[in-house]
């Protein structure tokens, strides 16, 4: 929790702390960078560094105040080359009006004004200082402030505001971006208070594997198609529930009814076959006799 000497706005709610712990935002890596030592709470027996959740919350509120101080929301550029943060930065940009760069950062975006992708933001926010090193380096050339989500092993060179958190887990990254967007909207007046429930759930900021989602959709479609085929087959075959209760001769013994129906069908088929056979024999015999009688006559005429 935040120290008591700080303003009340820095005090998080119990639900916020529970969400940070559930998303494992407090779990760092086994390596520790010297500038991240002030944000360390303790070292676990297995060598994992545990971050101070209270300081994480303080930096989220501080970063939100910096973002809200910029008049034009489009002058804020949010960047994530890490796949787990690309969905989060896109959602953050859509909710706050910022400019998102999800995926590979093209070198020269902040320094080469000839390129079409040239941008002049007043503030950039990166998901990982290590994977987004090119963006931080170019921001240092043109004096752009940098806010970064930093793990215990993240380099903090040219980072102005470091938010200590786990920047490698999909849930931790999504939750921090969601809380940052919520605080920005609260400071802008879109949300009345922090206790006001935001209609955007945090799940929208979590990374989703496209292949897993596609396989899930295919499996759901196959299940629905199989159920439809089974239902259609039952209707076409006539084996509905009410047909079994129909009162008919032999209804109590389905085998007897089936045998009687089969015998009747076989007798009808045999009668039809004999009749057709007799007609076929009669029609084929006459042409054979006529051909035999006519053939020798033709031969005698030629000789």
Swiss-Prot record:
Gene3D superfamilies for this protein: Glucose-6-phosphate isomerase like protein, domain 1
Molecular functions per Gene Ontology: structural constituent of ribosome
Cysteine pairs bridged by disulfides in the record: none
Stored InterPro entries: Ribosomal_uS2, Ribosomal_uS2_C, Ribosomal_uS2_CS, Ribosomal_uS2_euk, Ribosomal_uS2_euk/arc, Ribosomal_uS2_flav_dom_sf
SUPFAM superfamilies: Ribosomal protein S2
Primary localization class, coarse: cytoplasm
Location(s) in or outside the cell: Cytoplasm
Biased composition annotated in UniProt, kind: Low complexity: 269-286
UniProt GO BP: ribosomal small subunit assembly; translation
Domain of life of the source: Eukaryota
Chain intervals for the UniProt region annotation (Disordered): 269-303
UniProt keyword Transcription regulation, yes or no: no
This protein's UniProt keywords: Cytoplasm, Ribonucleoprotein, Ribosomal protein
Function: Required for the assembly and/or stability of the 40S ribosomal subunit. Required for the processing of the 20S rRNA-precursor to mature 18S rRNA in a late step of the maturation of 40S ribosomal subunits.
HAMAP family: Ribosomal_S2_euk
Family membership: Belongs to the universal ribosomal protein uS2 family.
Protein name listed in UniProt: Small ribosomal subunit protein uS2
Native source species: Penicillium rubens (strain ATCC 28089 / DSM 1075 / NRRL 1951 / Wisconsin 54-1255) (Penicillium chrysogenum)
Gene name linked to the record: rps0
């Amino acid at each position: 929790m935040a120290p008591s000497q700080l303003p009340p706005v820095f005090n998080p709610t119990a639900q916020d702390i529970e969400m940070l712990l559930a998303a494992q935002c407090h779990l760092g890596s086994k390596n520790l960078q010297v500038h991240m030592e002030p944000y360390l709470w303790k070292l676990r027996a297995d060598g994992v560094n545990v971050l101070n959740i209270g300081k994480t919350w303080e930096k989220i509120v501080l970063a939100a105040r910096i973002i809200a101080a910029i008049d034009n929301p489009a002058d804020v550029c949010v960047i994530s080359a890490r796949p787990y943060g690309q969905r989060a930065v896109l959602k953050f940009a859509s909710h706050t009006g910022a400019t998102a760069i999800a995926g590979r950062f093209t070198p020269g975006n902040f320094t080469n004004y000839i390129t079409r992708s040239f941008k002049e933001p007043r503030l950039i926010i990166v998901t990982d200082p290590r994977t987004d090193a090119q963006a931080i380096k170019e921001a240092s050339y043109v004096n752009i402030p940098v806010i970064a989500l930093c793990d215990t092993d993240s380099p903090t060179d040219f980072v102005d505001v470091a938010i200590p958190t786990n920047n490698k887990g999909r849930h931790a990254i999504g939750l921090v971006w969601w809380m940052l967007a919520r605080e920005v909207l609260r400071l802008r007046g879109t949300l009345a208070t922090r206790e006001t429930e935001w209609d955007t759930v945090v799940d929208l900021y979590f990374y989703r594997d496209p292949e897993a989602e596609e396989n899930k959709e295919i499996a759901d479609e196959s299940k629905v198609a199989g159920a439809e085929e089974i239902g259609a087959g039952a209707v076409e075959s006539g084996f509905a529930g009410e047909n079994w209760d129909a009162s008919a001769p032999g209804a109590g013994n389905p085998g007897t009814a089936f045998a009687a129906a089969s015998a009747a069908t076989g007798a009808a088929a045999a009668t039809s076959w004999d009749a057709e056979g007799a007609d076929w024999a009669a029609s084929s015999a006459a042409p054979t006799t006529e051909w035999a009688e006519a053939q020798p006559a033709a031969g005698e005429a030629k000789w």
